[in-house]
A protein has these predicted regions:
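Conserved, well-structured functional cores that handle cations and Mg-NTP chemistry
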Residues: 1-204
């Protein structure tokens, strides 16, 4: 978590009032435990907190505490995602600045991947399902030289890749690589007009 400045996080929390109704369980606590969920590959709150709470000796150094399952469940349900979105955007901008500073010819890969959400509790996802996917779609702009993502958005699965790509700020001197899902010759022309280049990636 060294890459995330607590001062920046606190600024976001104050701006979005993320801790207003959750004073006993801060945004920092929730962020820590959900990052740990990803790292540990936990698939349920029970297994997640069993693992997380077993490291109680390290909690003090991280500025967190032992967490109850009901507390985390309530926070996941009630706390706005806005603070986490702003933190993510801030980290992506930080990565983007690092990529630009390297001074190399820039290459960006554009792609998307589905996030399946089916079964109990995911009925809401059925209304926007695509032919093969129900859930969400992650759209990613990736800098392979630095091995970091520099932009990420989430949409419903029935949103075409090109629709999200049109919102990207094209950078001069950059080459964009994408598959035929991004084929829109007007958009390709717009890339060319910004003194950038593009390549179509052939799917195997």
């Amino acid at each position: 978590m060294n890459g995330l400045q607590r001062q920046f996080l606190q600024h976001v929390v104050d701006k979005t009032c993320a801790d207003k109704h959750n004073k006993g369980f801060s945004t920092w606590d929730q962020l820590l435990v959900m990052v740990y969920a990803h790292i540990s590959g936990s698939t349920s709150l029970r297994s997640l907190l069993s693992r997380f709470n077993s490291h109680e000796a390290q909690h003090y150094h991280l500025g967190t505490q032992v967490i109850k399952r009901s507390t985390l469940a309530d926070a996941n349900r009630k706390r706005s995602v806005e603070a986490f979105k702003e933190v993510c955007d801030g980290l992506l901008q930080q990565a983007h600045r690092r990529v630009r500073k390297d001074g190399q010819d820039l290459l960006y890969l554009l792609d998307s991947t589905p996030i399946q959400l089916k079964g109990y509790g995911y009925d809401w996802a059925a209304a926007t399902r695509a032919a093969r996917t129900q859930g969400l779609k992650l759209h990613l702009q990736y800098a392979p030289q630095a091995e970091v993502p520099v932009n990420a958005t989430i949409s419903t699965p029935n949103v075409n890749d090109i629709e999200e790509a049109r919102h990207l700020a094209i950078e001069a001197g950059t080459t964009y690589v994408f598959d035929k899902g991004y084929c829109d010759y007007n958009w390709c022309h717009a890339i060319d007009q910004q003194d950038a280049g593009y390549r179509f990636r052939h799917l195997r």
